[in-house]
Design a protein with these regions (language model features):
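Conserved catalytic core of the tyrosine transesterase superfamily
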Residues: 1-302
Length: 302
């Protein structure tokens, strides 16, 4: 890492070097692990693309280079929300470089951020949920599905849980946010706790600081990749689309609102800083009410 610092000081300014410095800055500022991983997922492919296209130095990156990259992403038929998020992350990267005086001006200043479709990706239907639960092969798999549906937890939050984070008597689950950040409380109901106990009987009750979810092949803590692969394979097997951790989170949000939960209570449970996204779910749940009125309204059914 000192080598990176030395090269930056000597104005070498290779794209790969400044990327490492950017990630180091985020780590030193104690960004949450999920946020840090998002930066890596969205910026590193751009850095690698630059390297494979002989764009080695910062001075080689022009607005045209960035537009070419974003256009190629569109040609791959990536979701508009995904491309929008990538562009925002790249913009943050270049803004940081300007702040650090490694660039005089960000090449992103002249690049329009691709618009994201406002539609929300679909949640699971009741039929999807039934199929998911009927086709799990192990106690762990069923426990994971119920836990995600019941808590609205993010994938990283689920995977970081230890035995001491879950109160099996009350259903209170503490989501640890790391130093400098406030922990969050979510809840799981009786059915989820009963299934979790069945999983514990199989794996052994985890100790206070021991990770709850283990790989079934290695016995080591389950990783984000392992979780995603398990859900993807299950979705393909039973023909349920978008079977990812975040679809469970969307399902939790939409069904909580459908069942009458306050949007502000939901905001706290999901750990959102604002309710902008949740308002879109609220609109969907209100559409449900309108459809129900069309079907069951007193006057129109006279």
């Amino acid at each position: 890492m000192w080598g990176v610092f030395f090269m930056l000081k000597n104005k070498s300014q290779k794209v790969t070097d400044v990327y490492e410095a950017f990630i180091l800055d985020r780590k030193s500022r104690r960004f949450k692990s999920g946020t840090l991983q998002t930066y890596k997922d969205r910026i590193l492919p751009f850095v690698n693309w630059c390297d494979s296209n002989t764009v080695f130095c910062l001075s080689d990156i022009t607005p045209t280079v960035i537009r070419t990259y974003l256009t190629q992403l569109q040609d791959k038929n990536l979701a508009s929300q995904t491309i929008h998020g990538i562009a925002i992350a790249i913009q943050s990267f270049f803004n940081w470089l300007v702040k650090e005086e490694l660039l005089k001006e960000s090449p992103m200043r002249k690049v329009a951020i691709p618009k994201a479709d406002k539609k929300i990706l679909p949640a699971f239907t009741q039929e999807d949920i039934t199929k998911l639960l009927k086709n799990t092969n192990t106690e762990r798999d069923e426990a994971i599905i119920l836990f995600l549906l019941d808590s609205g937890a993010r994938a990283t939050e689920l995977l970081n849980l230890t035995g001491g984070d879950i109160d099996m008597k009350t259903g209170i689950v503490t989501i640890r946010q790391g130093k400098g950040s406030k922990d969050r409380i979510v809840y799981i109901g009786n059915k989820t706790r009963k299934q979790l106990l069945r999983y514990y009987m199989e794996r052994g009750t985890p100790k206070e600081n021991e990770k709850v979810w283990l790989s079934e092949t290695k016995g080591t803590p389950l990783t984000n990749t392992g979780l995603s692969q398990f859900l993807k394979k299950l979705g393909i097997k039973i023909d349920v689309k978008n079977c990812s951790p975040h679809t469970f989170r969307r399902t939790f949000a939409l069904n909580s609102l459908r069942n009458g939960m306050s949007i502000y209570h939901l905001q706290r449970l999901m750990g959102h800083e604002d309710i902008t996204v949740l308002k879109q779910y609220l609109a969907l749940s209100q559409n449900d009410l309108q459809a129900a009125h069309v079907q069951h309204g007193v006057v129109d059914n006279l």
